[in-house]
Amino acid sequence: MSTTDLTSPAHAAVESAGTTAIAEDLLARVLEPYSYKGCRYLLDARYHADDDSVLAYGNFTISESAYIRSTGHFNAVELILCFNQLAYSAFAPAVANEEIPQLRGWSLEDYFQHQLASMFIRNSSSRFNRPINPAKFSARLQCRNLQVVQRTWRYLLVPCAIEFWDEDGGAASGEVELAALNIP
């Protein structure tokens, strides 16, 4: 999947109309590992899932970087942290509502048990087109063509594309391939 498959940020508000808000109590639970370290950046999120895809939108703020003094702009480490937060948050309600066939059989408790220990980034790439203001920015995540891979380890392959933008024209994007182990 290519980030060129994503819709432009100008259309994000229209597109997100078909999504459902993720409740703050669920976000708080999903993002607890980040809150624990003082780096919860995701403020709120919306999602939609079907048999073969997960779509999510999120709004973020990074008041203070978790690992370095402020650079004044959104950077590669923060891109991955924000990707993780939006992806974990989007998959949680999809698992709870049994919207992803390959994960049916997992309860929400199973999801939380596997969230950190069984989900991996297999590879990633990112592009930074214009600096993004970390104080207020948004993202769109699209994961498509989910498939179970049967090798030495059986896992769910999740190809994702993500884009970030701010109100001043800042823009960045990335492609991330996830692997979820210990699937039902």
Curated annotation (Swiss-Prot):
Effect of disrupting the coding gene: Deletion of the gene cluster mmaABCDE causes a significant decrease in the intracellular accumulation of zinc in Sauton's medium where metal concentrations are relatively low.
Q: Sorted alphabetically, which InterPro entries does this protein's record hold?
A: FcoT_ThioEstase (IPR022598), FcoT_ThioEstase_Rv0098-like_sf (IPR043064)
Name assigned to this protein: (2E)-enoyl-[ACP] glycyltransferase
Mind listing the UniProt keywords for this protein, alphabetically? Answer: Fatty acid metabolism, Lipid metabolism, Lyase
Stretches that traverse the bilayer? none
Q: What Enzyme Commission number(s) apply to this enzyme?
A: 4.3.2.11
Give a yes or no for keyword Protease in this entry.
no
| Enzyme superclass (EC) | lyase
* Family of the protein in this entry: Belongs to the FcoT family.
**Domain of life of the organism encoding this protein:** Bacteria
Which reaction is catalysed here?
a (3R)-3-[(carboxymethyl)amino]fatty acid + holo-[ACP] + H(+) = a (2E)-enoyl-[ACP] + glycine + H2O; (3R)-3-[(carboxylmethyl)amino]decanoate + holo-[ACP] + H(+) = (2E)-decenoyl-[ACP] + glycine + H2O
Q: Does the keyword rRNA-binding apply?
A: no
Q: Which GO terms describe its molecular function?
A: lyase activity
Lineage per the UniProt record:
Bacteria, Bacillati, Actinomycetota, Actinomycetes, Mycobacteriales
Entries under Pfam families matching the protein: FcoT (PF10862)
What does the record list as GO biological process? fatty acid metabolic process
Annotated source species:
Mycobacterium marinum (strain ATCC BAA-535 / M)
> What is the protein's known function?
Involved in the biosynthesis of a unique class of isonitrile lipopeptides (INLPs) that seem to play a role in metal acquisition in M.marinum. Catalyzes a Michael addition of glycine to the beta-position of an alpha,beta-unsaturated fatty acyl-[ACP], producing a (3R)-3-[(carboxymethyl)amino]fatty acid. Acts on the (2E)-decenoyl moiety loaded on the acyl-carrier protein MmaB, forming the product (3R)-3-[(carboxymethyl)amino]decanoate released from MmaB.
